[in-house]
């Protein structure tokens, strides 16, 4: 047995499910809108990575915030999901 650490690949759906279960706040980067980020908590998702985001806040490049509440974000618009 070697002393190497083996890395395990986690499918994206499993990662999103973990964020959902742990009620982890997330930051979502949008496709083709690089100056806007969405922050909130994931409340649900489907196999197309459409996401229901609770307590959503839109944050722009100048750190201006706009509260959106509960939103449905289409999976095609998501570039990156990051725990915050």
Swiss-Prot record:
GO cellular component entries: cytosol; nucleus; pICln-Sm protein complex; post-mRNA release spliceosomal complex; precatalytic spliceosome; U1 snRNP; U2 snRNP; U2-type prespliceosome
Q: Which GO terms describe its molecular function?
A: RNA binding
Pfam family membership, one: LSM
Alphabetized, the UniProt keywords read: Cytoplasm, mRNA processing, mRNA splicing, Nucleus, Ribonucleoprotein, RNA-binding, Spliceosome
Keyword Nucleus in the entry? The reply is yes
The organism's place on the tree of life at top rank: Eukaryota
Sm domain residues: 13-84
Does the record's keyword annotation contain Heme?
A: no
User: Which cell locations does it reside in?
Assistant: Cytoplasm; Nucleus
BP term (GO), one: mRNA 5'-splice site recognition
Which PANTHER family did the record assign? SMALL NUCLEAR RIBONUCLEOPROTEIN E
- What protein family is recorded? Belongs to the snRNP Sm proteins family.
Q: What does this protein do?
A: Involved in pre-mRNA splicing. Binds and is required for the stability of snRNA U1, U2, U4 and U5 which contain a highly conserved structural motif called the Sm binding site. Involved in cap modification.
On subunit structure and binding partners, the annotation says:
Component of the Sm core complex, present in spliceosomal snRNP U1, U2, U4/U6 and U5. The core complex contains smb1, smd1, smd2, smd3, sme1, smf1 and smg1 (Sm proteins B, D1, D2, D3, E, F and G, respectively), and is probably a heptameric ring structure.
Name of the protein in its database record:
Small nuclear ribonucleoprotein E
